Structure formats: C-alpha cells, structure tokens
From Swiss-Prot:
It is a multi-pass membrane protein. This is Undecaprenyl-diphosphatase. It comes from Photobacterium profundum (strain SS9). Belongs to the UppP family. It catalyses: di-trans,octa-cis-undecaprenyl diphosphate + H2O = di-trans,octa-cis-undecaprenyl phosphate + phosphate + H(+).
Length: 267
C-alpha cells in the first residue's frame, strides 16, 4: 500500500465511521473502481485505533463521568442517570457481539459484495428518511430504558451486514423510538466506544497471531488521518444535525447506492 492510498483510505474511514452513510460502501469503491488492493489486517487495526481515540477524546468529559458513575454503582450501589446510561450502553453492545460472533463467517462469505452494499445503502436511506420525518424528537439519551437500549442494540447488530452503516442503523432506531436528532447521534457515538474497542481488540489479536509483516509508516498515517478526520466529523455532525436533519445523508446514500449499481451494471 502506498502512502497516498493509506492517506485516502484512512480519510474515508474517519469521515464515514460516524456518519450515517456506511464506511464499507465507501471503502469498496477504491478497490472496485481504482483496483486498489485490500488494506490488510494491520491497517484495519490502525484506523480502529484512530477513530476510537477521536470519539473518546471528543466525549472525554462524558466518558469520565459515565465510567465513574458506573463504577460507583457497582461498588457502592449508588445509581444515577449517568450510571444507568452506562449500563444501557453495555446492554446495547451485547446483540452485536453475539451476532458478530456467530454470523461473521457467513457474512464475509455471502454478503460482502458490492451488490449487497448498494442494496442496503438504498434500503437504509429510505428507512432513515421515514423515521426522521415521523419521529417525535422528544427524548434524550438519559431517558434510555432497557427496551430502547436493546432495540438500538439489535439495530447495531444488523449493521454488521455490509452497507448498512453502524451509526446509520443506530440513529435510525433511536429516531424511531422518539429521540431527538442530537440525542440519537450522541447515543450512537457513545455506543461506538465499546464496539470499536472489542472489534479492534479482536483484529489486534488476529494480527499478533498471524505473523503478517507490518508497514509502520502506513499505519502511522492511518492512525493520524483517521483520528483527525473522525474528530472533525463528529464535531461537525453534532453541530449540523439539529439544523439540517438527516435529509442530506438520505440523498447522499441514495446517490451512492444507485451510482454503485449503475457502475456494476456497466462493467
């Protein structure tokens, strides 16, 4: 992988990881259109590190508060809105772990194709448009009960299917349940922390045991670029989503999905 390819792939990952637009749909384009090689396991780990660092740094105050409240609830039995939210985030993480553990090989074998990605990109664009239009937009993330957390967690599990978008699926589910746009985004971003930690740890373990040679210069680019772009993306999205809503992302997904189908039909 050249340094330019590393830069572009990390930029794509950072910009799309937290937007409801599907990072897998974007990452397949360089390989399909430009013939770029697969980025490899080590680079996957690098961009996970970069995006994880970005979301933790951006929400550093919330993360410290939530973890402190969670630990206090365990050892002192003192339950607060913050400790409850932390438990709900943990609950919402479970379905994706189970689904990923048992369905990963099937998905990699049968569903990781450009046609599937194009189709799911379009389907979830329509779902996002519908729920954003009809949502009551009245709840914040601290009003998340176990039923809501589990429902959003199931949406996150479904996002293992390529093209769905983890953030897109979780925001869609949260909006359907009546969350405000900002609360849906914030809960989705906070939910990403444990799932990125688990996915990154799994990939890191595979990397250590694989003996694959590591290009540290490409990895450094991957970490730095994905971190900067993801941090900027989170900041911009939270500033804009309450004003512009989800429609720009719906339109973008539709254009991307149909554009990918047109490209595949032309081959």
């Amino acid at each position: 992988m050249s340094h330019f390819e590393a830069f572009m792939l990390a930029l794509i990952q950072g910009l799309t990881e937290f937007l409801p637009v599907s990072s897998s749909a974007h990452l397949i384009l360089p390989s399909e259109i430009l013939g770029w090689p697969d980025q490899g396991l080590a680079f996957d780990v690098a961009v996970h590190v970069g995006t994880l660092a970005a979301v933790i740094l951006y929400f550093r105050k919330e993360v410290v508060t939530l973890l402190s409240a969670w630990i206090t609830s365990i050892f002192k039995g003192k339950h607060t809105a913050e400790s409850k939210l932390t438990w709900m985030i943990a609950l919402a993480t479970i379905p994706a772990c189970i689904f990923g553990l048992f369905m990963k090989d099937f998905i990699e074998l049968y569903l990781r194709s450009a046609w599937v990605i194009a189709t799911t990109t379009i389907i979830f664009a329509i779902l996002l448009w519908w729920v954003d239009k009809h949502s009551e937009h009245k709840f914040d993330e601290y009003q998340t009960g176990w039923k809501r957390a589990l429902f959003i967690g199931l949406a996150q599990a479904a996002a293992i299917i390529p093209g769905t978008s983890r953030s897109g699926a979780t925001m869609t589910a949260a909006l359907y349940l009546g969350f405000t746009r900002e609360a849906a985004a914030r809960f989705s971003f906070l939910m990403s922390i444990p799932i990125i930690v688990l996915a990154g740890s799994y990939l890191g373990l595979k990397l250590v045991t694989s003996g694959v040679p590591i290009d540290f210069s490409a990895l450094s680019i991957g970490i730095a670029v994905s971190f900067i772009s993801a941090y900027a993306c989170i900041h911009a999205f939270l500033k804009l989503v309450t004003r512009v809503g989800m429609m720009p992302f719906v339109i973008y997904r539709l254009v991307l999905g149909f554009g990918l189908i047109a490209f595949l039909l032309s081959k």
